[in-house]
């Protein structure tokens, strides 16, 4: 959430071609990641962009946005810290951007049901099987759990955003030294990104090398197959 807020702020405050290039690359990568939801653009890239059809999934293109958004966010931080008159020029943009992000977090926290609690394919499969009608209480419980997860994540984002905005505000009005503000912002950013990344890649995602070696030791049947070197030994 902090990277996103700083990215939006950078789109407003930063001048020059670098901003437009990063913004354009971000938008294009997001549009391309929609795949069949924007099929004309996907077909255009497949037909005319070399090697684009080698992607295993269209979502892989989001790696561009994962690079451009943090880069523009860091450029925004850099200008905030080095330009002495940044606050005078862009205080309204700072208030507006942070306020809008806070309002979005609050809205999601209080109204998690405003967003779909099931994916399109998930809903179609459950509806076709008639499971919504057969087990209404079960799906009510599932929806309640998903709402609580959405609300908890919105609250988490809200707290990180308030903490980072508070540090930056204190720095911009001269109440906190730039070095301390930079260190505090880096720690908050690390905590924000690390806790999200750990959901997808944690300690349970890794195994010791010795376990992997043991898993691939040749079995007697493997040795028997390898012993047959004829060209037509496989069916």
Protein language model features and the residues they cover:
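Conserved luminal/periplasmic juxtamembrane motif of membrane-embedded glycan-processing enzymes
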Residues: 1-235
């Amino acid at each position: 959430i902090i990277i996103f807020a700083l990215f939006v702020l950078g789109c407003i405050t930063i001048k020059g071609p670098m901003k437009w290039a990063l913004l354009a690359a971000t938008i294009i990568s997001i549009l391309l990641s929609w795949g069949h939801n924007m099929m004309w653009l996907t077909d255009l890239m497949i037909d005319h962009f070399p090697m684009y059809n080698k992607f295993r999934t269209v979502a892989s293109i989001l790696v561009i946005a994962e690079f451009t958004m943090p880069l523009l966010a860091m450029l925004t931080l850099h200008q905030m810290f080095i330009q002495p008159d940044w606050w005078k020029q862009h205080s309204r943009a700072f208030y507006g951007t942070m306020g809008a992000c806070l309002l979005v977090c609050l809205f999601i926290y209080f109204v998690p049901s405003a967003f779909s609690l099931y994916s399109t394919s998930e809903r179609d499969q459950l509806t076709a099987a008639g499971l919504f009608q057969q087990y209404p209480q079960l799906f009510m419980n599932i929806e309640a759990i998903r709402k609580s997860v959405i609300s908890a994540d919105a609250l988490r984002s809200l707290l990180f955003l308030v903490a980072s905005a508070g540090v930056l505000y204190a720095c911009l009005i001269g109440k906190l030294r730039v070095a301390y503000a930079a260190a505090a912002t880096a720690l908050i950013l690390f905590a924000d990104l690390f806790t999200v990344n750990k959901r997808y890649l944690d300690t349970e995602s890794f195994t010791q090398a010795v376990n992997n070696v043991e898993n691939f030791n040749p079995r007697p049947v493997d040795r028997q197959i390898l012993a047959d070197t004829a060209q037509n030994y496989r069916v």
